Structure formats: C-alpha cells, structure tokens
Amino acid sequence: MSRLVLAVDPGKASGIALFRKEDGQDPELLWSGEYQQDEYAQPIRKALAEAMMQGISIEIACERFTINAQTVKNAQSPYSLEQIGILKQCMIDIGMKAEDLNLQAPADAKALFPNPALKKLEYWHKGGEGHALDAIRHGLLRFVKTGWHPVGLLKE
C-alpha cells in the first residue's frame, strides 16, 4: 500500500519535499524544492490535490516553530508562523483537519538525519539554502515515527 508524506520547513524561504513509501520499502523522494512566499502554496496544493485524486493517503510533517526570547529578536520570525497557517488552510481546503498536521522539533530532525546521513541514504537536494534539506529531514523523521527503520545508515 502506498502512502505519501509532504514535509515542510516553513520560513521566508521554505523547503518542501514529497515522499512516497510502499509497504516494506524505503521512502522514495519524489521531489524537493525551495520556495519563496509567493510560490509556497502552489506545490502544497498540487501535492494534496494529486493525492486526493489518486486516493493515496497523505500525511503532512512540518517543522514546529516556537516563539521564545530569541525568535522575538529575529525579524524573520513571523514568516514561519504565517507559512504554517497557509499550510493548515491548504489542508482544510481539501477536507483534512488542521489538527492532522504533524509538527516536529527541528533538533530531532537534524539529530537523526545530519547531512552525512542524508548523503549516505541518497536523499540529497542540490542547490538552495538548505531549506529543502530540512524538509527532507522532516519527511524522513515522520517515517521513522511511524515505524520505518533507516537500515541504510548501518551499512558501511
């Protein structure tokens, strides 16, 4: 059975990645990219609509954004919250619940999938500022949280 995970690293420039996973197999990275604010909703809406039309289950994983003393000082801080709101609205527009959004800590994603691990597993996005790589990390973390074991990391 096929399932999709759409993973998002929200911000002024956002990373978005779409994965497909068949039972018993490793996730397949279908595409990844980095998007500015005026481009952000389009790939999300397209991925959600295609999943609905094909009748494939889709989960959404997104980097959690927490406001603290440091983020208050950061001029870019509202962008992440705004992008998460847009993501939730895209979900609602196709009949999903905003509560179905799987928010994940950035530290968890980076700890489990640092750059060398992404390269070893061949989930690498070339170019950009690293936002697509962060989205890829969140997609893979979602699969780990739902039972996938990245055994490729154990190989020498």
Language-model-derived ranges and their functions:
Residues M1-E156:
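Phosphate- and other anionic-substrate recognition elements at nucleic-acid/protein interfaces
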